[in-house]
């Protein structure tokens, strides 16, 4: 199944380091970030999961649950978490999904249908496409997707920025411009007429071109 933005995130049941979950129920009425990695006990992934552990409070503030995934079993995750805390300085307090039968990785199109049904004997190179991020909204639809090569660690500060943009634009008829950060000016989307925009933004807007209408970020 090919997944795209606005596809419904595949639901699944799985074991995690914090017990079994049913994914959609686990998300509840908030947001979620599902991020995967090719294999436990690998160097780049160790730095990524450690950084995400330190950043978790920022996701908590934004009503967003985070969950890791690899095709290794949960027992391996638990052992590896000790290394992550030792080397990266942050305890992993979010759940990590064990996917030894490759069901979740296949459902999320990170591995092809012909990848098999077991992670046994698979190397990190075999799982090279399993370094992805999915931002999922309260409606269980995919709002954003990112996939990185094995050789490049992800920028989770950018994932947080992307989440903030997704949350803002889900509530207001605006878009965020290049390199936008929370609190900076935004753009009124073309679907909003000038007449409707006047009602929403009585203070007006800057418009270097008719199609480029810039306003202060709406407040929640």
Predicted features and spans:
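Chalcogenol-based redox active-site neighborhoods
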Residues: 1-220
């Amino acid at each position: 199944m090919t997944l795209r933005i606005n596809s419904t995130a595949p639901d699944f049941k799985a074991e995690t380091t914090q017990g079994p979950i049913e994914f959609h129920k686990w998300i509840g009425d908030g947001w979620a970030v599902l991020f995967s990695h090719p294999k436990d006990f690998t160097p780049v992934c160790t730095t990524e999961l450690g950084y995400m552990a330190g950043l978790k409070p920022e996701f908590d503030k934004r009503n967003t649950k985070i969950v890791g995934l690899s095709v290794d079993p949960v027992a391996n995750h638990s052992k590896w978490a000790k290394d992550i805390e030792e080397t990266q300085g942050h305890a992993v307090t979010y759940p990590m999904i064990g996917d030894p039968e490759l069901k979740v990785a296949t459902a999320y199109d990170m591995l092809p249908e012909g990848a098999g049904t077991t992670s046994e004997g698979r190397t990190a190179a075999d799982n090279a496409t399993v370094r992805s991020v999915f931002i999922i909204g309260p409606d269980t639809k995919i709002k954003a997707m990112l996939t990185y090569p094995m050789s490049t660690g992800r920028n989770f500060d950018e994932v947080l920025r992307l989440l903030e943009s997704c949350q803002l634009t889900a509530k207001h008829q605006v878009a965020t411009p290049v390199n936008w950060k929370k609190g900076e000016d935004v753009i009124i989307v073309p679907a909003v007429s000038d007449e409707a925009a006047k009602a929403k933004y009585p203070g007006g807007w800057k418009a270097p071109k008719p199609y480029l209408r810039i306003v202060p970020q709406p407040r929640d």
